[in-house]
Amino acid sequence: MGGIRLRTKFLFSMVAVSAALTFTTLLVVRRTVQQEVRLGIQRDLQNSVSAFRNFQKQREVTLERSAALLADLPNVRALMTTHDPATIQDASRDLWQLAGSDLLLLADSSGKVMALQTTPPEITVHKAQDFFPQVVSSDETRHWWYVEGHLYEVFLQDIYFGPASGRQVLGYLLLGYEIDDRVARDLSRVAASEVAFRYGDVIVRSTLKPAQESELLRVAPRTTAGGSPQGDQIWLGGERFLATSVDLPTPGSPALNLWVLKSFDQATAFLSSLNELLLALGLTAVLAG
C-alpha cells in the first residue's frame, strides 16, 4: 500500500515537474520570439522610412522639374506681363490642365495672387493669399499646405522676364499635388506599412481604420521633436502597433508628421498556434512518461 502511494506521489511529482518545464518553455519561447519579432519590425520600420524618403525625393525632383518647365514657357511669361487678374485667371485654366496638378497658383512679382485653379470650391483666392507670403519669403521651394481639410505638397517657381540669370522676376508659379487616399495607399505599399498624415490634431489621410485614427490622435505626440516613438509600441483600437514618424516641413505651425506603423499583433499571431503545439507536446510527454 505504501509503495503505491509512493509511486503515486512520484508520478504526481513528475507530472508537476513536466508541466512546470512545459509552461516555462512556453514563456521563454514566447518572449524570445516576441523580442525577435519586435527587433525585426523595428528594422522594417527603419527600412520603410528610408523607402519613403527615397520615393518622396524622386517624386519631388520630378514635380519640381515640371514646375520649372511650366514657368519657363513663353506664353506663361507673356501672360504675366498683362498684369490683369481676369486675363490671367482665364488663361490659367489651360496651364492647369497642361500641368496635371491638383492646384495651380499664379502671383505677380509683389506676391499678389492673380489666379488660382483647384477643384475644392472652399479653397479661395483669399486663403491662397494668406498662405502665399509664407512660401515666397522662404528659401525653400517645396512646402506643405493644409487648407480646408486638404493637404497639398506645393512647389514654387519664379517666372523670369528673359533669362533666369538676369533675375528679373515677373511673378511666381505654384503647383500643388494633394495627398489623397490614393497617394496614401501608394505610400503604404512603398513602405509596406500602415501610414497616417497628421497635421496638429487632425488625421488628414491614412490607411488606418477610423477608430485607430482616433486612438492615434490620443496616444501619439503632435511632433517628433523632443522624443517621439521611434519603433515604440502603441495601442490603436485594441491592436498593438510599433510606430515611428517623419517630420514634414510646413511654414508656421502646427507640425505635420507622417506616421509609419506595423501591427505587432499580426506579426505575432502565429505564436498562439506555436503555444498550442508546444503545450500538446508537453502533455504528450507527460502522459507517455
What spans do the regions from the language model cover?
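N-terminal membrane-insertion alpha helix
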Residues: 22-48, 52, 56
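Membrane-interface helix-start motif
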Residues: 186, 244, 258-281
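Short beta-strand edge/capping elements of PAS-family sensory modules
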Residues: 170-171, 255-258
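Extreme N-terminal signal-anchor transmembrane helix of membrane signaling/transducer proteins, especially
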Residues: 4-32, 279-288
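Extracytoplasmic/periplasmic sensor domains and loops in membrane signaling proteins
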Residues: 81-103, 112-148, 180-192, 201-238
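A short beta-strand signature within small-molecule sensing/ligand-binding domains used
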Residues: 140, 149-163, 228-231, 237-247, ...
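Short, hydrophobic-rich beta-strand element in sensory/regulatory alpha-beta domains
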Residues: 67, 101-106, 194-197
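N-terminal alpha-helical signal peptides/signal-anchor transmembrane segments
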Residues: 45-66, 70-79
